[in-house]
């Protein structure tokens, strides 16, 4: 409990003692009245001050104004009627402050829970100077500096291990408890906890550009992206509060005036009392507090699972997802390509692979890496000149003075080279040397072990259609789609074709439905940004993915897509539960007040009780079920 909350608790206890003494201990009316006023001022002075400031700043209509008018009006009515019955005025203020304290504590607790879940900010970095370790601010560490990370410490900055081996706990980033073994030469990212050995890490980024900084910035900015529900509640409160104030004024004045015109007693006291109760009930605290809290808790719960959602607007859109479009490589497949065959080559297989690897040496594509791996020797890049990338088709380069073309059938057709079909399932890389066909290499990608379960989980979560887009050949794409149970597949697409195909799918979806695109974030930025929801998988350490996507999965587990949808739908369900419950109870009580059935005690429940229940319900969004 914070210092401010403790102070409020003491005020509540003092006011409660004074209130109970005045209510239940026999004493002269003057003494009991003094105790009531002492209790009222003790518990309500800050509400009265805020209400007065609001009036001075021309921001009249808020919950402080409602509470101040209702309670001062109740006191004035008691004085007018000479009843000495001030207990309702004090009780309204007392229970309102109890509700505010509970709400403050609950929100603070949920914030601390979320902060603990995302407690990845490093406090310092160790730099060795004169044989001793010196702790410095991570912001002061230059790129290329060697830092020491001891067991139990967080890795403060992204870098590469230059000495040592250890096991890393990545749970704060990925939500997974399985540790990761690392050794010299491995890249490590900030935010992971070093569990066993001492590591020396050469930093590759400044702290401000490291993974931990990007994630923290994302989480801190998520509250600025408001959902439609939050925006509606804000607009609703601006209209609702003045409306109920004027309604209460009408309830206090019109019925007595009508009674007078009809020759009956005005009964001013009865109708003013009802109007004051009307004000107590109408306070919109339950909605104004619980709706943002529900989204905040939902974002925190998702973050605990390694699913970073950039704002409540994206959380709301994710809950409406009916179509999920996948980029094949790196999402449904591991993106780890292996050479599985060399066919129809007049050259030696080793020579063919060497030429192919050299021609592709400037590319970062997984196929290029697999060719270099299959070659098995260190490549001398000085043997390669005039490298020309042909988008979506391949590459043409000069290797040892020979013109070497490496790519798909479209590249061979473009160069006028007659090529041969291959019946093997996989990516077929055709080669031509000096304009003559030199054979083809079969490269196969490995389907992720849980990809099929992920597609099934999406169907269970209510996704109506799954689609796969790939630049791979149709035969390979169809094979993968059939194996995984994907509904629709589009193959042999150039990067621009993927955007066009996505546009077509966007036109086919329902008006209120959303389409999510899932990619690895490396070269999917145009498609990620065009989809209703862009989801980047395996983004741990990828700046591009964190920047381009709306939802970032910190590891490459496709099951987390369905998990994210489930979390978002639970959060939205809680939001709607709170809206319906809060408005339902308040409207019912307002009606009962207007016809004289409900009193101010019922008004206290309709305000404070509903707020407490709504806040408790909102906190449920922080908890995520384990599948």
Positions of PLM-derived features:
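Soluble-to-membrane junctions at the N-terminal ends of transmembrane alpha-helices
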Residues: 1-16, 34, 45-75, 216-250, ...
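P-type ATPase nucleotide-binding
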Residues: 339-465, 474, 483-502
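Conserved ATP-binding TGD loop and adjacent catalytic N/P-domain core of P-type ATPases
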Residues: 399-401, 427, 433-577, 585
């Amino acid at each position: 409990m914070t210092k401010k909350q403790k102070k409020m608790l003491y005020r509540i206890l003092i006011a409660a003692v004074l209130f109970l003494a005045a209510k239940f201990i026999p004493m002269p009316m003057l003494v009991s009245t003094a105790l009531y006023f002492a209790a009222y001022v003790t518990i309500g002075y800050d509400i009265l001050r805020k209400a007065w400031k609001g009036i001075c700043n021309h921001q009249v209509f808020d919950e402080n104004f409602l509470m101040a008018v209702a309670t001062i009006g109740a006191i004035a009515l008691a004085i007018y009627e000479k009843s000495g019955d001030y207990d309702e005025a004090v009780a309204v203020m007392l229970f309102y402050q109890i509700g505010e304290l509970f709400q403050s504590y609950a929100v603070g607790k949920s914030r601390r829970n979320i902060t603990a879940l995302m407690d990845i900010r490093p406090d310092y970095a160790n730099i060795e100077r004169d044989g001793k370790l010196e702790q410095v601010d991570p912001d002061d560490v230059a790129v290329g500096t060697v830092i020491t990370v001891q067991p139990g410490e967080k890795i403060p900055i992204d870098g590469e291990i230059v000495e040592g081996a250890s096991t890393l706990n990545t749970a704060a980033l990925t939500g997974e408890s399985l540790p990761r073994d690392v050794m010299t030469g491995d890249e490590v990212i900030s935010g992971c906890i070093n569990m066993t050995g001492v590591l020396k890490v050469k930093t590759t980024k400044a702290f401000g550009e490291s993974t931990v900084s990007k994630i923290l910035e994302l989480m801190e900015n998520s509250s600025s992206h408001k959902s439609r529900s939050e925006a509606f509640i804000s607009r609703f409160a601006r209209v609702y509060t003045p409306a109920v104030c004027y309604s209460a004024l009408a309830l206090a004045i019109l019925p007595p005036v009508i009674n007078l015109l009809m020759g009956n007693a005005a009964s001013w006291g009865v109708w003013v009392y009802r109007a004051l109760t009307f004000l107590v009930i109408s306070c919109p605290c339950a909605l104004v507090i619980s709706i943002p809290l529900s989204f905040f808790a939902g974002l925190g719960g998702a973050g605990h699972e390694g699913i970073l959602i950039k704002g409540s607007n994206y959380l709301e859109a994710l809950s409406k997802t009916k179509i999920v479009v996948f980029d094949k490589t790196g999402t449904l497949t591991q993106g780890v390509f292996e050479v599985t065959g060399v066919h129809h080559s007049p050259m030696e297989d080793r020579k063919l692979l060497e030429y192919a690897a050299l021609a592709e040496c400037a590319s970062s594509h997984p196929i290029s890496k697999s060719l270099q791996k299959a070659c098995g020797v260190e490549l001398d890049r000085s043997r390669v000149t005039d490298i020309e990338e042909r988008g979506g088709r391949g590459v043409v380069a000069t290797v040892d003075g020979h013109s070497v073309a490496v790519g798909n059938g479209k590249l061979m057709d473009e160069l006028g080279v007659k090529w041969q079909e291959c019946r093997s399932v996989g990516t077929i890389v055709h080669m031509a040397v000096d304009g003559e066909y030199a054979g083809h290499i079969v490269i196969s990608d490995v389907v992720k072990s849980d990809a099929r379960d992920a597609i099934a989980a999406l169907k269970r979560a209510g996704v109506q259609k799954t689609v796969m887009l790939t630049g791979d050949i149709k035969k390979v794409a169809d094979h993968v789609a059939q194996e995984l149970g994907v509904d629709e597949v589009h193959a042999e697409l150039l990067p621009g074709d993927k955007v066009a195909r996505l546009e077509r799918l966007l036109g086919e979806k329902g008006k209120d439905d959303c389409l999510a695109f899932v990619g690895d974030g490396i070269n999917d930025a145009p498609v990620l940004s065009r989809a209703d929801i862009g989801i980047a998988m395996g983004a741990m350490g990828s700046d591009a993915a964190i920047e381009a996507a709306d939802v970032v999965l910190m590891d490459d587990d496709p099951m987390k897509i369905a998990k994210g949808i489930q979390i978002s739908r639970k959060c939205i369900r809680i939001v709607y539960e709170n809206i319906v419950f809060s408005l339902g109870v308040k409207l019912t009580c307002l009606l009962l007040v207007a016809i004289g059935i409900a009193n101010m005690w019922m008004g206290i429940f309709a305000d404070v009780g509903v707020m407490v229940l709504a806040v408790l319900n909102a906190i449920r969004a922080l908890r995520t079920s384990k599948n």
